[in-house]
């Protein structure tokens, strides 16, 4: 129809595994077409995610990399190594971003170690280095998410900002397209570059994606097609494509504006404050723990539970009956398997390891918390 459509897809390992278990070969084959057919490469970008739909801030730190690697392994097993090599962006479940310095550092380092080049983040989950919310303009440009741990080590990754909150209708009605139509170029790195409106839908909620999205997607692309030529008209574009075009224009992604997870400015402000000779002997990890404890004691609103697109809901409070067994299972898994894997990495291919890993990853699925009580928690 003369359109040049774009879409980014994020399927958890839970979902891919479930489709396989259900014997829905026709769905898997449709996804294989989107992942593997060269005609689809310019139009469809797959984003990586955790294998299970786990909330990063309250997932045990040693399991973050396991979640990332398990998804990559499963995706490659289904669609091949070439398809996996094209997966450069990461979509964290629930747009949940850790703000505890050590958790965020481990998360970003794991993403980088696993080959990811950029991350999609919720605008309210990040702040500028001096603790301010991102300006409207900054949410429409790429940023550099800096993660610093309690020992002062840093790692960073390019971040594209998802605006607004959790509302499937934002994608179901193609809100990003209509917002983008009214925008002008913005200054970045000595250039005037096109802003990017990035949005994500929370799967099938309330029939929106099934009943509203298909026609809205077509209508939006017809509007873009009919919007006139020239070099400045609005187009659909995927995340990696956008960043690669910026790099080709001479923009160095390592010089993007630096941002950090919310509440971290308050931590670093106290960490860097002058201290007595006695307190300066305290190591960084202990000092970080002290600072966080002091902030939590003085301000009940200060939280290290991370931020997501549902900031009115906590992923931690009231879920001890799920979180504590999950953490115990994780600790037992690593206590048992880590020495074995260190001595013989082929252990990860054994049925015992893979069954234990499967149950560990499944136990960390956020939906079991979000939906409260019942058979799972019992």
Q: What residue ranges belong to the model's regions?
A:
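Active-site and substrate-binding clefts of carbohydrate-active enzymes
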Residues: 1, 14, 136-167, 175-179, ...
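Catalytic alpha-helical scaffold of carbohydrate-active enzymes acting on polysaccharides/glycoconjugates
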Residues: 1-89, 95-168, 175-194, 211-231
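Active-site metal-binding loops of divalent metal-dependent hydrolases
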Residues: 94-95, 203
């Amino acid at each position: 129809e003369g359109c040049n459509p774009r879409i980014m897809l994020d399927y958890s390992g839970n979902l891919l595994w479930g489709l396989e278990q259900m014997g829905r070969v026709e769905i898997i084959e449709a996804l294989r077409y989107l992942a593997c057919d060269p005609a689809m490469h310019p139009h469809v970008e797959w984003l990586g995610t955790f294998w299970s739909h786990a909330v990063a801030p309250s997932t045990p730190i040693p399991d973050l990399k396991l979640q990332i690697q398990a998804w990559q392994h499963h995706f490659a097993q289904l669609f091949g190594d070439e398809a996996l090599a094209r997966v450069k962006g990461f979509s964290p479940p629930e747009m949940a971003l850790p703000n505890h310095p050590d958790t965020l550092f481990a998360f970003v380092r794991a993403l980088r170690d696993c080959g990811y080049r950029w991350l999609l983040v919720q605008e309210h989950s990040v702040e500028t280095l001096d603790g301010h919310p991102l300006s409207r303009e900054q949410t429409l440009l790429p940023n550099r998410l800096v993660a610093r741990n309690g020992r002062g080590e840093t790692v960073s990754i390019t971040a594209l900002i998802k605006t607004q909150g959790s509302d499937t209708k934002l994608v179901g009605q193609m809100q990003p397209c209509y917002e983008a139509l009214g925008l002008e170029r913005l200054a970045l790195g000595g250039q005037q570059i096109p802003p990017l409106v990035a949005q994500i839908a929370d799967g099938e909620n309330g029939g929106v994606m099934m009943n509203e999205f298909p026609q809205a997607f077509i209508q939006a692309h017809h509007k873009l097609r009919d919007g006139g030529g020239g070099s400045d008209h609005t187009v659909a574009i995927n995340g990696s494509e956008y960043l690669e075009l910026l790099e080709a224009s001479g923009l160095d992604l390592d010089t993007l504006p630096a941002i950090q997870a919310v509440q971290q400015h308050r931590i670093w402000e106290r960490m860097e404050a002058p201290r007595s000779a006695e307190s300066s002997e305290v190591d960084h990890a202990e000092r970080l723990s002290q600072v966080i404890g002091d902030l939590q004691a003085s301000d009940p609103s200060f939280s290290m539970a991370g931020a997501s697109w549902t900031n009115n809901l906590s992923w931690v409070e009231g879920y001890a009956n799920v979180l504590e067994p999950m953490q115990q299972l994780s600790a037992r898994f690593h206590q048992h398997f880590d020495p074995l894997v260190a001595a013989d990495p082929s252990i990860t291919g054994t049925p015992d390891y893979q069954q234990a890993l499967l149950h560990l990853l499944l136990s960390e699925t956020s939906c079991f918390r979000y939906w409260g009580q019942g058979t799972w928690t019992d």
